[in-house]
């Protein structure tokens, strides 16, 4: 039996059958266009050997398409009604693929590796505006087995995630996601392919985790790097010397550490790439050690 994807009429009929009304607080807008669904799944690079963590499966459009690729899917849905309905929908529109689906009714921000029987190798997510960045950073940190990410978010969030250093959209999210891997845009998604129709465009972003990380990835090191990123963007128009003065203990010490990391102290924090923040932390530790030895 070939998997049948959900169209607009089917999605609305299914919602009516289970007496479901989309909730804005959960960012519930469901893709009903088959071409868009196939485009997203194709761009994700998911194949039959993957175990996919699907965040926000909703009524099941993307989940069906992921199963159609032969992947195993763990779908995490915060809405209890949708989580309860999803296995039935998958069974009705496929055949043996239901055996490759696991559904959890849980808040993604609380999900931990111990909650899953199989650790995911890929993440496909449709994230609402208010939790997009925290959820993405949480999953990247807690699930190092995830090698690739395809996320659909509001267009402005997509622009921030994929922005380059020095650009107007470059900020804390841009720098932090690059701690984990390479980031690139995969185009826009029109509001008209959703039900209900949102007021804004969505954007697709793919993240590929570094094959071998250029820097340590332990939680303590990551937290220190992220602290530097937060400091730099708290007053993004300040020079790096002034921005890091309190952290370093003085303006002069800030300049010394920046120079040790081959960073011009007059540069603004908004121009620093993730490698700059990492180098600043590492060279600062080396500089402090040299001072103690002297």
Swiss-Prot record:
State the SMART domains in the record.
Answer: rADc
Recorded GO MF terms: 16S rRNA (adenine(1518)-N(6)/adenine(1519)-N(6))-dimethyltransferase activity; RNA binding
Give the catalytic activity: adenosine(1518)/adenosine(1519) in 16S rRNA + 4 S-adenosyl-L-methionine = N(6)-dimethyladenosine(1518)/N(6)-dimethyladenosine(1519) in 16S rRNA + 4 S-adenosyl-L-homocysteine + 4 H(+)
Coiled-coil zones: none
Q: Which family does it belong to?
A: Belongs to the class I-like SAM-binding methyltransferase superfamily. rRNA adenine N(6)-methyltransferase family. RsmA subfamily.
Q: Where does S-adenosyl-L-methionine bind?
A: 29, 31, 56, 77, 107, 126
Native organism: Mycobacterium sp. (strain MCS)
The catalytic activity of this protein is classed by the Enzyme Commission as 2.1.1.182
| Annotated protein name in UniProt | Ribosomal RNA small subunit methyltransferase A
Q: What does this protein do?
A: Specifically dimethylates two adjacent adenosines (A1518 and A1519) in the loop of a conserved hairpin near the 3'-end of 16S rRNA in the 30S particle. May play a critical role in biogenesis of 30S subunits.
Question: Is the Heme keyword given for this protein?
Answer: no
Which PROSITE patterns does the record cross-reference, listed alphabetically?
SAM_RNA_A_N6_MT
Could you state one GO cellular component term attached to this entry?
Answer: cytosol
Task: Give the source lineage, highest ranks first.
Answer: Bacteria, Bacillati, Actinomycetota, Actinomycetes, Mycobacteriales
Instruction: For this UniProt record, give its keywords in alphabetical order, as a comma-separated list.
Output: Cytoplasm, Methyltransferase, RNA-binding, rRNA processing, S-adenosyl-L-methionine, Transferase
Compartments reported by the entry: Cytoplasm
């Amino acid at each position: 039996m070939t998997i049948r994807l959900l169209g607009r009429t089917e999605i609305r009929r299914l919602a009516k059958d289970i007496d479901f009304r989309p909730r804005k607080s959960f960012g519930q807008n469901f893709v009903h266009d088959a071409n868009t669904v196939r485009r997203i799944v194709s761009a994700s690079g998911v194949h039959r050997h993957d175990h996919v963590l699907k965040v926000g499966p909703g009524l099941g459009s993307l989940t069906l398409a992921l199963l159609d690729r032969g992947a195993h899917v763990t779908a995490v849905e915060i809405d209890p009604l949708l989580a309860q309905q999803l296995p039935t929908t998958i069974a009705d529109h496929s055949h043996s693929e239901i055996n490759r689906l696991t559904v959890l009714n849980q808040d993604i921000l609380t999900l931990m590796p111990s909650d899953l029987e199989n650790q995911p190798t890929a993440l496909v997510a449709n994230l609402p505006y208010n939790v997009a960045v925290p959820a993405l950073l949480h999953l990247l940190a807690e699930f190092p087995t995830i090698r690739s990410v395809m996320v659909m978010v509001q267009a402005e969030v997509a622009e921030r995630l994929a922005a380059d250093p020095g650009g107007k959209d470059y900020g804390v999210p841009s720098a932090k996601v690059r701690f984990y891997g390479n980031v690139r845009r995969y185009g826009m998604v029109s509001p008209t392919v959703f039900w209900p129709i949102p007021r804004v465009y969505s954007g697709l972003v793919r993240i590929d985790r570094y094959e071998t990380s250029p820097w340590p990835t332990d939680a303590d090191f990551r937290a220190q790097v992220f602290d530097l990123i937060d400091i730099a963007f708290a007053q993004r128009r300040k020079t790096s010397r002034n921005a890091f003065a309190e952290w370093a203990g003085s303006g002069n010490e800030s300049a010394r550490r920046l120079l040790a990391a081959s960073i011009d102290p007059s540069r603004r924090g908004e121009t620093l790439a993730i490698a700059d923040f990492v180098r600043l932390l590492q060279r600062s530790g080396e500089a402090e050690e040299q001072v103690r030895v002297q």
